[in-house]
């Protein structure tokens, strides 16, 4: 039998496979109708494991057993997605516990940020809410999350990611711990400046203060001043405030231009951070389960079983529903060695059918899924 004949036989088999697949999906559709009527869950892990064991047993060698399992995992995954889609169309998913609003009520809002006046968080707050907003600052990110949870603030402004230094891992952990939700974001271009008392010459400086990340981002500039002592503080604005209050010309701070204005300091040198394209993304957080009706990004977190292929199957919900995943991060789960929680950003709105479909599948098949916000 030549190659052409062999390919012809494969084509005939493939036609039968496709016909059987469509027949199977029609029965899956009927299963979905039954589950809509009875309220039975789509995902039945025990049933699927039993089915896969039977499929493996039908094969004649280990290679085919592995391949058959992969094939039927995909078939059953598509069956579930069909069922989720029918549940969405039938309105059986219920609405998400978030209320859509035309705009955020910010006129009388109280906003909290971590740091001090002149910090980048302060600037992000002013850009998002306006300079006349009622605001106060706290020492830690946890304090900010507590303020909105307890009601002393309506919104918090928190840095979640820097384009050069990466994520602010503490913020991710706090989003899991607190029942607070993301409703907006603000991106601020970062330009670190060397600040000193008015009239100070750079040659007078002996000590420079700043946040550890800012010192790291300015490493190239600082390397040209090896005799300077570098001291880390928890916020750039605190560094500027310290230099201003102590009145010592041998001290300088690395912070933004807004900190110089806030504390009456002189900019001794601009752009001391080596990366020109350096930005920080800030999130706007509230304790209300709301989202803007024109929101276009969704953030969630979830855990997956510690087994082969589990993350792959979870991510397939984004592919099937044609949702663009823009970010995925992992964080270790406390007290569970080598297990991770995944944070995912993707494009969409809670009102979209594809989003509802994906979220239902993720809720059923992942562990401890939490919606962090639509903004």
Feature annotation, model-predicted:
Residues 1-375:
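Domain-level signature for soluble enzymes in the chorismate/prephenate branch of the shikimate pathway
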